[in-house]
Amino acid sequence: MSSRPILDAGPGLNFLALHKERLLFSAVGPLSAPACVEEEILRKAQADSRFEAADRVWRKLSERLMSVLPDDPTAELERAVERISSLPLDERYQRRRDLGETMVVAHAAVAADRGVRMIVLIDDQWGRRLAAAEQRRLERLRSNGRPVGRIDLISTTTVLERAAGSVHLPDRASLRALYQRLRTLDDGLLPLQTTGLLDLPAWNRH
């Protein structure tokens, strides 16, 4: 059993601010996001003109494409947040720094503990380390015979790799242009030449 991938604010802001939501959904399908990630996207879009378009795009997304996961306390979510952050959910929620990444991983962990295969879309290195720690925990449980799911970790690079050769990203020139724009929004993205995206087999079909 699988569920919608869970989106962190960073990739969401970047793709939506550039009006590349069709590329995003064509690559990964319908998405979900914790309530705090929705809040972060809208807050940053209103505060930083570079992300202004993300506000309008987000508000137009239908439930079919984007569902918001409530961050209301449940026993499972509270356990996951405390395990991941070493803080109770209510206290962690008051500390806004890296909250989105924490809640993305926590929601995925709750579903994975129920046997669901989850995907999380995170670029932030700290958030990816959180997800990797949960991956290892689930692997240990599986090795002990527990019927748990798993968490797969993807990134902006994964999205672009899946979109390569499509109408949204037909050739290397379009990739270079888009990646340059993405890096103006997120200086944490690796230089294009180090990602392997320029060497994908998809380009050889054009």
Residue ranges and their predicted role:
Residues S2-M118, Q125-H206:
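Active-site-proximal, substrate-binding regions of enzyme catalytic domains
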